Amino acid sequence: MFSLKLGKNKKKKKVPKGDSELFGSEASVDDKVSLTQYNYADEREKEKPKKRKIELATAESETIALKRAKNNIGDDSIVQELEALPEKVEDKEYEEMPVEEFGAAMLRGMGWTDENELEDSKSHSKKLPHEQIHPEGLGIGAKSQEMSNPVSVKDLVNDFMPVKKVPKQ
C-alpha cells in the first residue's frame, strides 16, 4: 500500500510589517491600500494547505474499498460481501466471452427482439421520418396546413383569383 501526500509548496515572501519602513513617513493613501492588500495576501499564504492522500493498491494487497470498509464500518456483513467479490479477472474469462455475440447480447439487454427486425424489414417500403417533406419555418414534428388538410384540384380552381393591375390615382 502506497500513499502520496499532496500539498502546496509555495515559498513565502517576507514584507516589512509597518508601512513607514517601506514608504517612509510620507506614504500616500494608494500606497497604504496596496500594502494592506499585499499583507492580506501574505496572511492567506501562511494558512496551511490541506493535505490530501491518494491511496494506491498493489496487485498483492487488498482493494482500497475493502480496506476502507474494514477501517470505517463496524458492520461485518458489508466486509463479507466485499470479500466474496472476485479480486482478479483471468485471461481465460475473457476468452470464454464470444466477441461476435456481444452486440446481439447488448441489443437484447436494451429490449431488442427478433420481432423488431422483422418489423423493420416491412417498414422499409414506407418513407423514413427524415425523408418526409419538412416545410421551411416549421419545427420538428409540426404539421403544416397543407399536410393536415389535403386540397383537391376543384378547391384550387374555385379559389383562383387573377392578379389585375390597378391604375394609381
Curated annotation (Swiss-Prot):
GO biological process: mRNA splicing, via spliceosome
Keyword annotations of the record: mRNA processing, mRNA splicing, Nucleus, Spliceosome
Stretch list, region Disordered: 1-28
Subunit structure: Associated with the spliceosome.
Gene source species: Candida glabrata (strain ATCC 2001 / BCRC 20586 / JCM 3761 / NBRC 0622 / NRRL Y-65 / CBS 138)
Function: Involved in spliceosome maturation and the first step of pre-mRNA splicing.
Cellular component GO terms, alphabetical: spliceosomal complex
Annotated compartments: Nucleus
Coiled coil feature spans: none
Family: Belongs to the SPP2 family.
InterPro entries recorded: Spp2-like, Spp2/MOS2_G-patch
Pfam families tied to this protein: G-patch_2 (PF12656)
Protein name: Pre-mRNA-splicing factor SPP2
